[in-house]
Design a protein with these regions (language model features):
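Thiol/selenol-based redox catalytic cores and closely related redox-interacting motifs
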Residues: 31-112
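Local sequence-structure signature of Cys/Sec-based thiol-disulfide redox active-site neighborhoods
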Residues: 1-18, 26-31
Length: 112
């Protein structure tokens, strides 16, 4: 099990705590330090069951607006996340072939 984690983020910490309380020790991926590449992002989309990259993006992030991404296509958005990982919504928990966004944190329980 993996968690794409940002330690300062309260939702990310709460999600990690939910896993730990269930005796799950996930591989913690600090995605700002080790950004996912485009293939990893595409794999995340499949596991999340989404077709639009925006569904896993922080669209309210100032950088999103600065880069003018509001009308960008999926490929452009994937490249933007790979280059600027702070645009990736967090946390994301991956278990086998499924993933869930921890917003709210309890949502990840569905794939445990």
């Amino acid at each position: 099990m993996d968690i794409y984690h940002k330690p300062p983020c309260s939702k990310s910490r709460q999600t990690l705590e939910i896993l730990i309380q269930r005796n799950i020790t996930p591989r913690v991926i600090k995605y700002l330090e080790t950004p996912p590449n485009i293939d990893e992002l595409k794999s995340l989309m499949v596991k999340l069951g989404i077709t639009q990259v925006r569904e896993m993006m922080r669209t309210k992030e100032a950088l999103y607006k600065e880069l003018g991404l509001s009308s960008a296509d999926n490929e452009t958005l994937l490249k933007a996340i790979a280059a600027h990982p702070k645009l990736l919504e967090r946390p994301i928990v991956v278990s086998n072939n499924k993933a869930k966004l921890g917003r709210p944190p309890e949502q990840v329980i569905e794939i445990l």
